[in-house]
Amino acid sequence: MRKLYCVLLLSAFEFTYMINFGRGQNYWEHPYQNSDVYRPINEHREHPKEYEYPLLQEHTYQQEDSGEDENTLQHAYPIDHEGAEPAPQEQNLFSSIEIVERSNYMGNPWTEYMAKYDIEKVHGSGIRVDLGEDAEVAGTQYRLPSGKCPVFGKGIIIENSKTTFLTPVATENQDLKDGGFAFPPTEPLISPMTLDQMRHLYKDNEYVKNLDELTLCSRHAGNMNPDNDKNSNYKYPAVYDYEDKKCHILYIAAQENNGPRYCNKDESKRNSMFCFRPAKDKLFENYTYLSKNVVDNWEEVCPRKNLENAKFGLWVDGNCEDIPHVNEFSANDLFECNKLVFELSASDQPKQYEQHLTDYEKIKEGFKNKNASMIKSAFLPTGAFKADRYKSRGKGYNWGNYNTETQKCEIFNVKPTCLINNSSYIATTALSHPNEVENNFPCSLYKDEIKKEIERESKRIKLNDNDDEGNKKIIAPRIFISDDKDSLKCPCDPEIVSNSTCNFFVCKCVEKRAEVTSNNEVVVKEEYKDEYADIPEHKPTYDNMKIIIASSAAVAVLATILMVYLYKRKGNAEKYDKMDEPQDYGKSTSRNDEMLDPEASFWGEEKRASHTTPVLMEKPYY
């Protein structure tokens, strides 16, 4: 056994040595061999013909008689551009004795910055109507909000009513339309609760006491158990009012209820179910709608403020371009544009309901037009025997660009991958606050990324291995826009970007290898697809040291396990008592049938089929 241990240990050390130092080959001799990215262009010339031979031009690398072959010359760039203003010395990323090759890798410098605008990923549920999860209460399944980001400015409008949705729900002998959506009064009071009251209530709770006000409000609402069912994972939503610093727990999770089958807009019929819908309204601009799943770090990962001097775009091989296919609407201001985006955003509202005709009208129209399906739907309404549990997962028209000059709101459903610097635009999302704006466009992002990529690439090539003329070779990334035009190394004179508050320059004479399709999808051009067939979508990291450390640690762990095993073999094996198996705790009642009851528990004795069902909407009695 000891011999086996020694053999395994020696093998482990040999494996570690191979990872760190290889088997004698010089990695730097072939820096692009077996590489998926950053390969020099040998077959495709990305520059116009007049720039293929920079030695024939006025500005060169001071190597007129160097005798370089054509393959080397086609990658060279003139150092100074005719008519270009020289950049300050500290901003010039290249020296005059360097040969520049252009990378093939079409990376996106905006990836990290734009992560919070990937709403499908960061929010993961509906926005206009959020019913993204199901939970069981007292043996019955209900839907509930589940979005991971706050929805700023969202509220509920009760149709034809002076009652606001933050009014406590009607209880006992009250008429239905006398109440709203909020939790009824309790002793002690749990809703509404001020920020100071919540801080005091949770002052000894290490997990809650230091949370921000929105997350604290969400967790406070999540502490309430419906119907005293402690086994239920149903959690109430909440609304936080920034103006008075109050957290309102919502007893009703439904956010939309329309149609003559489900509600009555007649205000005089006080005890009939009211109609309601979600909205971003002037009355709600201080409100924030919260689900049980709001993440603790929402300020970092979720959008809140709108972006001034910016418009959402798509990153297309070196530059951020306009989204070509959008839906355009008129909007007097940013608030109206944000409201429009919200109305068209991702929604979990069920689709199977009739929101216009009453049962009598449907029967009448059915006989008149000999439409049997219409007559059938009056007696057997859609949803009565089949629950419509549509979940958007955050997919929808969640983004918009507002043009302050033309007063047009451009709305689209494709995830933006970059920002365009434009003084006439404000970028907004359905999650964002309808009014709040920030003006901090990252003007240095491109220049910083160019520098970072060159430094990263320098680890893969020998910068000190100069050619006969003392020239160094660097690999420049495919970024063709920057506030430092010298960093672009453009074969033509870069153009100034109009309406740019960052004073950007763009290089337009380099052929693009990608394009945008009719459905707003960025794809590699046909002539370059073979070259990019084996390149992964995501840029690999070059932090080889992390891989080495991880591999070494794994080998060390293996060696330690072997040592412990051999040590234990020397003596008698110790006997360990098995932990007692956990006792069966109370479990919520499970349903054997998959066809859940789709009828809403609307207030009153009669149950009606509803498109909002199954949502917990029971009248509380005391």
Curated annotation (Swiss-Prot):
Cleavable signal peptide: 1-24
Pfam family, one: AMA-1
Region annotation Disordered: where it falls in the sequence: 577-607
Cytoplasmic side: 568-622
Subcellular location: Membrane
Positions on the Extracellular side per record topology: 25-546
Transmembrane segments: 547-567
InterPro entries: Apmem_Ag1, Apmem_Ag1_dom_sf
GO cellular-component term (any): membrane
Amino-acid biosynthesis is among the record's keywords: no
Keyword annotations: Disulfide bond, Glycoprotein, Malaria, Membrane, Signal, Transmembrane, Transmembrane helix
Glycosylation-annotated residues: 286, 371, 421-422, 499
Bilayer topology annotation: Single-pass type I membrane protein
Bridged cysteine pairs (disulfide): 149-302, 217-247, 263-275, 320-418, 337-409, 443-502, 490-507, 492-509
Family the entry assigns: Belongs to the apicomplexan parasites AMA1 family.
Stated role: Involved in parasite invasion of erythrocytes.
Protein name in the entry: Apical membrane antigen 1
UniProt source species: Plasmodium falciparum (isolate thtn / Thailand)
Gene behind this protein: AMA-1
